[in-house]
Structures are given as structure tokens and as C-alpha cells.
Design a protein with these regions (language model features):
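N-terminal prepro-regions of secreted/extracellular proteins
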Residues: 1-34
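Lectin-like carbohydrate-binding module/patch detector with strong preference for beta-trefoil
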Residues: 30-179
Length: 179
């Protein structure tokens, strides 16, 4: 039987390691990154969530996946509202992620951007599923954010809502922008 002791040197080394992870921008599992710009990376496709064209501030512009690069439209802000609920707004356009029409619980309804307001369709639950990935589910519809078809690594594939299940395309990595 091996007994591990907590020595002062070991505790210092552990603290330095954890501080290094924090300084490097590692995300603690269980809590989404808030109060900074992040990239939402689909766990299945490895592509970043963005807004079609990347610049329009119009409402109802489709959210889709694209290569993760330095374009500001690939960055999002996750802002806590209350009770574990968040608004997710695009850093380039300032618009909030929502579901088309805001009420349908059908699968395959497009995700898009819209004015940030108090409508529950503009709010999301972000739930850790383990391994550094999260399900992002719409508060109004109860459906999870995913990518159409769930497998394509092509750019410009539409983001939409679908039943929350164990398919990896329904999960997202949340990383500080620029990393």
C-alpha cells in the first residue's frame, strides 16, 4: 500500500501548476467562462460558432460554423442573467444568440442573432458534460445548440437546435478568444 503525503514542496508545485493553467487561459470544468470573450467550438467538428458574413448587425442573421481564427465574429461574450442562465452575444455584432421564431420546440430550427432583450429565447443554460465540453440549451425551447448534420467539417454549415442527447455534435468547448 502506498501512502501519499502532502509535503510543502508538493503543495507549492501543485499551486504553481494550477496558477500556470489559469494564466494560460485554461477553462475550469463545470463553469463556463464569463466576463471575457470566448470561442464556442463544436466538439464534433472542431469549428467555431460565428454569424453568417461576420459583420451584419441585422436581426435574423444565421449562426453557423467556420474555421477558428482571429476574426472577431468568432468571439462571443457569455453574460450571466440569473439562476444559471446566460445570454450569449456575438463580439462583432453585439447581437444575442437565439432560435428562429423563439418558440418552436421542433428539431432543426436555425440558430441566429437577434437584439439582446429579456425574451427567454435569447437565454441559454450551459451544462458541463465532462471532459471540458458543455451542452448549450435554449431556455425557451429546451433544445441543444448543434451543427446541421452533426458531422461536416465544412465552413458555413448552419447551427440549429436539436434534442439534447449524448451526440458529441451537441457539445461545445469554450475557450478564451485568441487561444
Amino acid at each position: 500500500m502506498t501512502i501519499f503525503r502532502r509535503t510543502p514542496a508538493g503543495l507549492v508545485a501543485s499551486g504553481v501548476f494550477m496558477l500556470g493553467l489559469y494564466a494560460a487561459g485554461a477553462v475550469a470544468y463545470g463553469q463556463p467562462v464569463t466576463n471575457q470573450r470566448v470561442m464556442l467550438i463544436n466538439a464534433q467538428t472542431g469549428k467555431c460558432l460565428t454569424i453568417a458574413g461576420g459583420r451584419s448587425t441585422d436581426n435574423n442573421v444565421t449562426a453557423l460554423q467556420f474555421d477558428c481564427d482571429g476574426d472577431p465574429s468568432r468571439s462571443w461574450s457569455i453574460n450571466a442573467t440569473s439562476g444559471g442562465v446566460y445570454q450569449i452575444s456575438n463580439a462583432q455584432t453585439g447581437k444575442c444568440l437565439t432560435i428562429a421564431g423563439g418558440r418552436s420546440t421542433d428539431n432543426n430550427v436555425e440558430a441566429l442573432q437577434y437584439n439582446c432583450d429579456s425574451d427567454p429565447s435569447r437565454t441559454w443554460r450551459i451544462t458541463a458534460t465532462g471532459g471540458g465540453v458543455y451542452q448549450i440549451s435554449n431556455v425557451q425551447t429546451g433544445k441543444c445548440l448543434t451543427i446541421a448534420g452533426g458531422r461536416s467539417t465544412d465552413n458555413n454549415v448552419t447551427a440549429l437546435q436539436y434534442n439534447c442527447d449524448s451526440d458529441p455534435s451537441r457539445t461545445w468547448r469554450i475557450r478564451p478568444a485568441g487561444q
